[in-house]
């Protein structure tokens, strides 16, 4: 593959479900680019906890062989070495962070200050303490390096881009609310179904969700509400609401207090049936009102407040009519006031998340090409 001035060098950090899928999608993108004679991505470094491979002289790595190549060098490539490597790139560079690492997220200013662009689904950078967040944003603004994280909320759904476009076009954001967790979407859609009486116990549905791969290995990591809190923090900050951290506002936890100290997931799941009656009474109260129960995040931009809560919704409400593990986000604005703008779809999964990251990479590449284009 020949490298033109408008190609972009890419370093991939994290090769798990999302990272591995992204490498496959980049390979397909490059094959189409080669056929069409358009710009492609030169993947020049791949790093994970298992191993790494860094290309000599920035030559594109053969993406059909990346697993074999990274197995030659144990452990992750040093972040400082990666900053230095990308800073010396003869072509514009993108760091793609597919991890959930706080350490990598806190290193973003090092990359950005060297004019290394970043595309990532990592929520930690944008929901960390306000000081960490502001340092990242400041580094991007001062260097001009692009920073995109569409997939940090809603996987491949156009949530962040929609919010930014509403703001850029002069709309006034009043409220953002939604069902941000695919796991909790599934649990509540089954436990509190629309149009019929819920019969399954909360504990049984959590167990089924875990068996089907919807939850984290320890379901408490979903039920504590912090994943939703991080996503609401990200959107709140973009909308101009000061949020000190994802733990600085009210977050409803679905973990019964006595089970917070359970030593492992098995002990937690064994004890959860003891609290089914408490959850059932909540559901029965909603059903008497002709409503369903949903777990939602809310950024009340007009009043500068943020929270994560359980809420009851009428059967006709969009939040009451989701399928499976779908996400749904509603934007109430000055323009979209009577009927809020709604984004709905699959908000989890390696394929859609990787596609969201690739979409950001394509946007970065397009902007880099535009800045490199000769003036008329």
From Swiss-Prot:
InterPro entries: Asp/hSer_DH_NAD-bd, Bifunc_Aspkin/hSer_DH, HDH_cat, HDH_CS, HDH_short, NAD(P)-bd_dom_sf. The modification Phosphoserine is found at residue 201. It is an enzyme of class 1 (oxidoreductase). One of its GO terms (biological process) is threonine biosynthetic process. Keywords: Amino-acid biosynthesis, Metal-binding, Methionine biosynthesis, NAD, NADP, Oxidoreductase, Phosphoprotein, Sodium, Threonine biosynthesis. The keyword Ion transport does not apply. One of its GO terms (molecular function) is metal ion binding. It comes from the Eukaryota. The active site is at 231 (proton donor). It catalyses: L-homoserine + NADP(+) = L-aspartate 4-semialdehyde + NADPH + H(+); L-homoserine + NAD(+) = L-aspartate 4-semialdehyde + NADH + H(+). Pathway: Amino-acid biosynthesis; L-methionine biosynthesis via de novo pathway; L-homoserine from L-aspartate: step 3/3; Amino-acid biosynthesis; L-threonine biosynthesis; L-threonine from L-aspartate: step 3/5. NADP(+) binds at residues 17-18, 99, 123, 213, 216, 349. L-homoserine binds at residues 216, 227. Its cofactor is a metal cation. PANTHER family: HOMOSERINE DEHYDROGENASE, PTHR43070. Catalyzes the conversion of L-aspartate-beta-semialdehyde (L-Asa) to L-homoserine (L-Hse), the third step in the biosynthesis of amino acids that derive from aspartate (the aspartate family of amino acids), including methioinine and threonine, the latter of which is a precursor to isoleucine; production of homoserine leads to a branch-point in the pathway as it can either be O-phosphorylated for processing to threonine, or O-acylated for processing to methionine. This is Homoserine dehydrogenase. It comes from Schizosaccharomyces pombe (strain 972 / ATCC 24843). The gene is hom6.
């Amino acid at each position: 593959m020949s490298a033109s001035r408008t190609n972009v060098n890419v370093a991939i950090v994290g090769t798990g479900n999302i990272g591995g899928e992204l490498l496959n999608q980049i390979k397909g993108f490059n094959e189409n680019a080669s056929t069409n004679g358009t710009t492609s991505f030169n993947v020049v470094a791949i790093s994970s906890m298992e191993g790494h491979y860094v290309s000599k002289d920035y030559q594109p790595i053969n993406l059909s062989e990346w697993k074999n190549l990274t197995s030659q060098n144990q452990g992750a490539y040093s972040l400082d070495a990666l900053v230095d490597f990308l800073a010396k790139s003869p072509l514009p560079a993108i760091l793609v962070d597919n991890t959930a690492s706080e350490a990598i997220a806190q290193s973003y200013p090092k990359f950005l200050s060297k004019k290394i662009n970043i595309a990532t689904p990592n929520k930690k950078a944008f929901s960390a303490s306000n000081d960490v967040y502001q340092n990242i944003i400041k580094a991007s603004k001062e260097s001009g390096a692009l920073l995109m994280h569409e997939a940090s909320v809603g996987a491949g759904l156009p949530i962040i881009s929609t919010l930014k476009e509403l703001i850029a076009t002069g709309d006034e954001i009043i409220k953002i609310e939604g069902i941000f967790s695919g796991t909790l979407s599934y649990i509540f859609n089954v436990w509190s179904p629309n149009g019929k009486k819920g019969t399954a116990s909360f504990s049984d549905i959590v167990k089924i969700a875990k068996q089907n791969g919807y939850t984290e290995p320890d379901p408490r990591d979903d039920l504590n509400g912090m994943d939703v809190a991080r996503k609401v923090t990200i959107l709140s900050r973009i909308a101009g609401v000061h949020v000190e951290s994802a733990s600085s506002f009210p977050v409803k936890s679905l973990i019964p207090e006595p089970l917070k100290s359970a030593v492992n997931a098995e002990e937690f799941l064994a004890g959860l049936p003891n609290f089914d009656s408490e959850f059932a009474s909540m559901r029965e109260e909603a059903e008497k009102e002709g409503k369903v129960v949903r777990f939602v995040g809310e950024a009340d931009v007009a009043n500068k407040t943020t929270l994560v809560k359980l809420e009851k919704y009428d059967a006709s409400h969009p939040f009451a009519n989701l399928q499976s593990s779908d996400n749904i986000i509603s934007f109430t604005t000055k323009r979209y006031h009577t009927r809020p703008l709604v984004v709905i779809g699959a908000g989890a999964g390696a394929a859609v998340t990787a596609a969201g990251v690739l979409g950001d990479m394509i946007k970065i590449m397009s902007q880099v090409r535009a800045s490199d284009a000769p003036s008329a």
